[in-house]
Amino acid sequence: MAPTHHAIDYIELNVTDLAASKAFYADAFGWRFNDYGPDYAGIVAPDGDGEVGGLNPSGAVVRGGPLVILFSDDLEASVAAVRSAGGQIVEEPYDFPGGRRFHFADPSGNELGVWTSDSGH
């Protein structure tokens, strides 16, 4: 699929430990990676066509930046997967207009959110 003008195309997460971060996201969400050596890993798109982001171990992890929010068909299963993979829940699931969501910190301290809609999609 061709990129869309001005659409968000790629999200890069700064991480403190590339191997630990790859293991966390693979275990919690089933993400796959393209390895570019010890200094970078690309996050493979869900359909396997290209990349949607990357993990950068050379950047500083800064709290309070933009919040990346993932979608889940089963929010409670996602909470359990994050905990099982070693993530920390920083905001327990809560309701908001149209759905529910929670926030977690990955092993590097990046905060992300996960949401689900009232209808599941």
For the regions a language model picked out, list residue spans one by one.
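Short secondary-structure junctions
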Residues: 30-36, 88-93
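Catalytic core of tubulin tyrosine ligase-like
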Residues: 25
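Conserved short beta-strand elements that form part of the metal-binding/catalytic scaffold
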Residues: 31-65, 111-116
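Residue-level detection of beta-strand scaffold positions
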Residues: 10, 21, 40-43, 52, ...
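Vicinal oxygen chelate
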Residues: 1-4, 8-16, 59-121
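N-terminal beta-strand motif that seeds the catalytic metal site of vicinal oxygen chelate
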Residues: 1-22, 49-50, 66-68, 118-121
